[in-house]
């Protein structure tokens, strides 16, 4: 029986089944080939994207470097022209005694004090002293505004004892207010200027405002933490031709032209908030410092004053203005400007490219964005590469773009 079974022929595959097996094997080989090809293409694509990302980052870094060179050249040109307008003065005991004596005279004596200070902005000419005397006659009238970097109504809010009196606020500032650390204008920070120029002020004896108007502006010295002279001059070529005081230029025409006084103050962005709130447009930085900050308006897409106050309660306790705090000390202390930008994370990502000098957010805006592995601070590099070409034509970083668009989510959340 077993022999009979063994003698029987083995079953053969039907012709149809054999062809099917051949097709399955061929298909398996094809799948293996395609899988290998796909892996090679993916690797090559990843390498190409990496190279593209590197090339784009290098191009954008080069653009920022060119911008820095342009700012330096503009500042050199401005200083050369402004040097012809500087009016150094040494204010010693004798000069002070003369001013104190003049202050005892009626309005004409106070007009002479103003004239000697060099603060009156009008060019010298007939009627100049008369204009100063007419101003001095009005005493503490809040509506009286001298032709100087002095905001009378604003100064009187800090010195209500002078309002409506016969005292001349500008001469009061020159003889008393400056020494007490009072600010003559929202855009001139006496303490900030004095701290940064202590040696120069000690040598000449002038008040901070007098030094700035006579000498400091022409030398490129900043009058306020939020007014960067070098940054501003680059946007106003006419300053290089005239040598005009940059802060006076900003108040006269620059603000209306939408020029930015500081890297962290975007005038167009702020103006759009004023328009949306139905607020009459004025000098944006002036409005921000006198009202907008308290209202929670944002000076820049990446800085949120309300968020900053919530995160750092000492700012409220000290009655400090959030952006000023961030620019002067907060940024270097590791504080973040808003939910869009994590300072500690940025510094960690930025470290391999070298140390950050100055404010971290300013560093990010001036090229740091293109030095880190995650330009979005939380988005993968491939997302960056897919849209980075857009940024080649913009003077804007990825985070700024997202923040301006209102972003559906916080990138670094």
For the regions a protein language model found, what residue spans apply to each?
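Charge-rich, low-complexity intrinsically disordered regions
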Residues: 2-5, 16-413
């Amino acid at each position: 029986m077993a022999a009979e079974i063994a003698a029987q022929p083995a079953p053969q595959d039907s012709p149809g089944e054999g062809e099917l097996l051949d097709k399955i094997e061929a298909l398996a080989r094809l799948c293996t080939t395609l899988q290998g090809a796909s892996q090679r293409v993916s690797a090559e694509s990843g390498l190409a994207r990496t190279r593209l990302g590197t090339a784009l980052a290098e191009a954008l870094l080069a653009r920022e470097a060119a911008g820095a060179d342009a700012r330096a050249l503009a500042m050199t040109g401005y200083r050369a022209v402004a040097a012809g307008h500087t009016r150094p003065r040494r204010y010693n005991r004798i000069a002070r005694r003369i001013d104190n004596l003049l202050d005892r005279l009626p309005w004409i004596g106070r007009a002479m004090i103003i004239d000697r200070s060099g603060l009156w902005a009008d060019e010298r000419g007939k009627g100049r002293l008369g204009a100063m005397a007419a101003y001095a006659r009005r005493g503490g009238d809040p509506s009286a505004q001298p032709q100087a970097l002095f905001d009378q109504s604003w100064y009187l809010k800090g010195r209500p004892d002078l309002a409506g009196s016969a005292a001349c606020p500008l001469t009061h500032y020159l003889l008393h207010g400056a020494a007490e650390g009072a600010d003559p204008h929202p855009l001139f920070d006496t303490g900030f200027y004095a701290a940064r120029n202590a040696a120069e002020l000690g040598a000449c004896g002038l008040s901070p405002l007098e030094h700035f108007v006579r000498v400091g502006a022409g030398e490129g010295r900043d009058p306020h933490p939020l007014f960067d002279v070098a940054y501003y001059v680059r946007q106003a070529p006419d300053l290089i031709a005239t040598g005009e005081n940059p802060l006076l230029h900003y108040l006269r025409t620059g603000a209306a032209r939408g020029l930015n006084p500081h890297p962290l103050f975007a005038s167009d962005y702020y103006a759009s908030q004023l328009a949306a709130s139905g607020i009459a447009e004025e000098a944006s930085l002036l409005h921000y410092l006198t009202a907008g900050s308290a209202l929670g308006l944002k000076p820049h897409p990446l800085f949120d004053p309300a968020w900053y106050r919530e995160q750092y309660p000492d700012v409220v306790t000290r009655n400090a203005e959030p952006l000023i705090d961030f620019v002067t000390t907060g940024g270097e202390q590791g504080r973040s400007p808003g939910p869009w930008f994590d300072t500690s994370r940025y510094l960690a990502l930025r470290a391999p490219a070298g140390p950050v000098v100055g404010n971290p957010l300013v560093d990010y805006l001036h090229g740091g964005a293109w030095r880190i592995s995650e330009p979005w601070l939380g988005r993968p590099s491939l997302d960056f590469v897919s849209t980075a070409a857009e940024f080649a034509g913009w003077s804007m970083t990825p985070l700024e773009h997202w923040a301006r668009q209102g972003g559906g989510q916080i990138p670094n959340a």
